[in-house]
Amino acid sequence: CPAAQEENCMDIVPYLKLMVQKNGSDLFFSTGAPPNLKAEGETRPVGTAPLQSGQVRKLAYGIMSDDQIKEFEATYECNLAISVNALGRFRVNVYRQRGDAAMVIRYIKGVIPPVEKLNLPIILKDLIMEPRGLILVVGATGSGKSTTLAAMIEHRNQNRTGHILTIEDPIEYLYTHKKSVVDQREVGLDTLSYENALKNAMREAPDVIQIGEIREMFTMQHAIAYAETGHLCLSTLHANNANQALDRIINFFPDSAHQQLYMDLSLNLRAVVSQRLVKGKNGQRLPAVEILLLTTYISELIQKGDIHTIKEVMEQGNERGMQTFDQSLYKLYQEGKITLEEALAHADSRNNLSLKIRLSDTDGVAAPGGLGVAEDQF
């Protein structure tokens, strides 16, 4: 918390402690409802007393700097990150709803877990060691994209020399210099805007560039340019799968630019890693991961703009670790990590996955695991 607000920060610390104790991911503060904590994908109230008008604003202002308060009062939005001694780092979004302040706080784990501990495909360790190209990690909000990206970057940090540059809004995981030098630039703190940071990134001589998120054409153009000029560029994108990610990228650009874009992607895209979190039998969440790799055939399809054939090609074979969501879910089910109901609930093709499971030699299915906390209250 900012030094000037340390006393006010005490108001919110008990909630942050609870989130850490319960391994929660998000805290929600909204007038008229009690604070709510999300843990292992389930959201439950903390206590029963609803927050009164002005309370959320007071909590929020207690962790914001004067400049952040001015930004919020001018734009009704503010993103920030805070660090609390003995607890860790938290990402905060403050916004207005129905004329009053509301706030969401996300817990950013202090230790970056390795790829294996996150139950992610080992091929991600190979991808992050690529010398150049574009790697996208896509998924819905809260699907673990940032954590996956951090695990990949930390693997490179531990195993290869070089310069890793991240441009984030805000910084989510803190890296320490290991084999690589890792420079982290936070928008609003270390640079005035994404645009300024992206324009100057090349002058900072990076080997790897991480862009926090691609939301529009300008950022996508820079990501492709970095890959074209011999850098490894990584970023996240909001999309449900590889096909949707490619469609979204194409829709960033006018029709007149599509042919060149297809060519650029066919030459520079290395992988699209799509992720969903599913509930394991033990109540903890596991990643189901779709991986699109730029094989020769996939490159040809992208160059022709034949995006919707890609899914069929992925289903026909898992070359070098390429896999669909349904193949990932099938594997998790076969390993006894998730129930049949959970696998089918997240399948792209429920009927196809159900048939594949029925034809397998799998035994009975256990009931889904619980949240691991009291059912009524935290």
How would you describe each model-predicted region?
Residues 1-2:
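Short, low-complexity, intrinsically disordered N-terminal modules
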